[in-house]
Amino acid sequence: MCGIVGAVAQRDVAEILVEGLRRLEYRGYDSAGVAILDTECNLQRVRRLGKVKELADAVDSNPIVGGTGIAHTRWATHGEPSEANAHPHVSGDISIVHNGIIENHEYLRALLQERGYVFESQTDTEVIAHLVEWELRSAKSLLEAVQKTAAQLEGAYGTVAMNRRDPERLVVARSGSPLVIGLGIGENFLASDQLALLNVTRRFMFLEEGDVAEITRRDVNIFDVHGNAVEREITESNAEHDAGDKGQYRHFMQKEIFEQPTALINTMEGRISNDTVIVESIGAGAADILRNVEHVQIVACGTSYNAGMTARYWFEALAGVSCDVEIASEFRYRKFVTRPNSLLITLSQSGETADTLAALRLAKEKGYMSAMTICNVAGSSLVRESDLAFMTRAGTEIGVASTKAFTTQLATMLMFVTALGKQKGVINPQKEKEIVTSLHQLPTQIEKALAFDKSIEQLAEDFADKHHTLFLGRGEFYPIAMEGSLKLKEISYIHAEAYAAGELKHGPLALIDADMPVVVVAPTNELLEKLKSNIEEVRARGGLLYVFADEKAGFEPCDGMKIITMPHVSEYTAPIFYTVPMQLLSYHVALIKGTDVDQPRNLAKAVTVE
């Protein structure tokens, strides 16, 4: 959600700033802007509604020469998408960009209006610009003005300030919204995501909660929430430099779907041997923590929540440990009871999901024995603040609709559940070997699922003119139906719902008619015959059935029911396997409908505000 890029350099920074924004397009936005101090210390600001390309074209047509600048992509929260509401915002000599939500902006706006400030936008961000300008009147430096401003702000923010009268300096403040500083030679940078800066540096410092930093070409000085000078660890990133390249694929989502076999190999490398899960790969002290776990609480949002819902079945059936799963935005506001020896697990692709991060911090206060995150971004807030971090290693995921991050989350969870069950003496060596063997086979099985791409593309034509779709599953395949439903609604804008198939009689059957496609996930398991009865209930009411069925399940196509016969796979990895056709179906339906597959309307990749 929103993207920030900043630079202080001897060279011209316009191209660096715009390229940084381009690399952050996947996060979702509706407008973009840049502000640069030129060689005469005049502020040159360009803002555009729409894509970064429109901003880039505007900057190219009137090149800006200058070494200090800030840039931003905005995802509207306060105020409609418009050029007037686009960042950077200006107050006197001060320019500001900001991610997050200032919760007391109405009070501050009224206060500033009493002081004579005139607001040109509907945003909460403009409040910060005017506050910094006001504080600078009495402060000794921009740093002091930003520190005094930050003390007045309530809510989440990652903000950058630039002063026309102090042209080789940026000051940044972070509270609840991530910011990273990129270190160069005689130049320094900042961004909301290190991906924005991988073309200019590999050395990064991640700001912590409450940090304020002063950045010049030669120095970075960081101060904590109390104003004390602090040092932050410098890390070297090995993230993919060309992650923003689609290669031979039409969309990033398509690319990421087809990257899943390789991503899963990376996820499992060094974590499983021929027949065991390597407990030490989870992290130092993991073995002792796992032995004491009596309950697991999973907290997540969106696709990650669906992964958690799937893993719940594994925790209880395989490891014998009770497990609850809750949406982070609900968990953090509920008066819950912390069970003894309860392990909190957070799931997040970005590691910066605002509600999930807040839930982690709350859980620490409430006495959870330990906290682990399953995450895709090293150095993210969830990774830094958790006791254990089990990385998914999916590689950079650009498409807003998550694909490889989901399947690698599931594989990571299955490895963790196996390790937990082993440490607690519930999973014996024979069962562990069966699970590990199925994991070794998984990348090849995913390749087989991807081979259905063309047949699913033809199937997608049936959905293009539909307005609603129902997804059904039972047991651990109910969350897979949930994920299929989420993918379809995210990128095709078709209203889709998922139900446990046994719930049909309790409401959903009222929706069934000849215009309602019903997608069913039908592996071979102990619930197959029950599921077949549910399918017959839909057929009897004229529903259009599309059944993704195990080859051993005994389905035959008939009027009103199309069967997509899938290879038989292990019961342990079947939920991961059946995710892939759901992804392909959603992708091809969206393609036919002509929607923006990689950046669907109103959505953002990393939800860093509540």
Swiss-Prot record:
Per the UniProt entry, what are the Gene Ontology biological process annotations, in alphabetical order? carbohydrate metabolic process; fructose 6-phosphate metabolic process; protein N-linked glycosylation; UDP-N-acetylglucosamine metabolic process
The protein depicted here goes by the name: Glutamine--fructose-6-phosphate aminotransferase [isomerizing]
HAMAP family found in the cross-reference section = GlmS (MF_00164)
User: Which Pfam family would be a valid example here?
Assistant: SIS
Q: Where in the cell is it found?
A: Cytoplasm
- Keyword Manganese listed: no
**PROSITE patterns of this UniProt entry?**
GATASE_TYPE_2, SIS
Q: Name one GO molecular function term.
A: glutamine-fructose-6-phosphate transaminase (isomerizing) activity
Fill in the subunit field for this protein.
Homodimer.
Q: What is its EC number?
A: 2.6.1.16
Q: Which reaction(s) are listed as its catalytic activity?
A: D-fructose 6-phosphate + L-glutamine = D-glucosamine 6-phosphate + L-glutamate
Known role: Catalyzes the first step in hexosamine metabolism, converting fructose-6P into glucosamine-6P using glutamine as a nitrogen source.
Gene that this polypeptide is encoded by: glmS
Q: Where is the signal peptide?
A: none
SIS domain ranges (all copies): 286-426, 459-600
Q: Domain Glutamine amidotransferase type-2: where?
A: 2-218
Look up the domain of life of the source: Bacteria
Residues at the active site: 2 (nucleophile), 605 (for fru-6p isomerization activity)
List the GO terms this entry assigns under cellular component, sorted alphabetically.
cytosol
NCBIfam families with a match to the protein in the record = glmS, PRK00331.1
Keyword annotations for this protein, in alphabetical order, are: Aminotransferase, Cytoplasm, Glutamine amidotransferase, Repeat, Transferase
